């Protein structure tokens, strides 16, 4: 499907930043909830990435759930010209320091 390159870049940047995209199965929806572009563009761009094996698709209750694969991370890193140390949000683990309770003697 033909779509403006800046819309495709927005979709790819969001996918790489978050690691996942949720899209409602509504092809007539004027705008995607999180990405500033048409919902149809989001669905079709991610279907294209799914057919290439860069994204896994899960469909449930009228929503598409797209998850980035390892090959997809490499592809988007090359497509967006990003360095190796930048990773999607799903790869980052927050470290919460656990504190032990203080002993009373």
UniProtKB/Swiss-Prot annotation:
It is found in: Cytoplasm. Component of the ribosome, a large ribonucleoprotein complex responsible for the synthesis of proteins in the cell. The small ribosomal subunit (SSU) binds messenger RNAs (mRNAs) and translates the encoded message by selecting cognate aminoacyl-transfer RNA (tRNA) molecules. The large subunit (LSU) contains the ribosomal catalytic site termed the peptidyl transferase center (PTC), which catalyzes the formation of peptide bonds, thereby polymerizing the amino acids delivered by tRNAs into a polypeptide chain. This is Small ribosomal subunit protein eS10A. Its main location: cytoplasm. The N-terminus is not modified. One of its GO terms (molecular function) is RNA binding. One of its GO terms (biological process) is ribosomal subunit export from nucleus. It comes from Saccharomyces cerevisiae (strain ATCC 204508 / S288c) (Baker's yeast). One of its GO terms (cellular component) is cytosol.
């Amino acid at each position: 499907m033909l779509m403006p390159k800046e819309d495709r870049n927005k979709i790819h940047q969001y996918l790489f930043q978050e690691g996942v995209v949720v899209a409602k199965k509504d092809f007539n929806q004027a705008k995607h909830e999180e990405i500033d572009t048409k919902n149809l563009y989001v669905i079709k761009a991610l279907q294209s990435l799914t057919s290439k094996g860069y994204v896994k698709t899960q469909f449930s209750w009228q929503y598409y759930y797209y998850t980035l694969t390892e090959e997809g991370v490499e592809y988007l890193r090359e497509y967006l010209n990003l360095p190796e140390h930048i990773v999607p949000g799903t790869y980052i683990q927050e470290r919460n320091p656990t504190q032990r309770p203080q002993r009373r003697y």
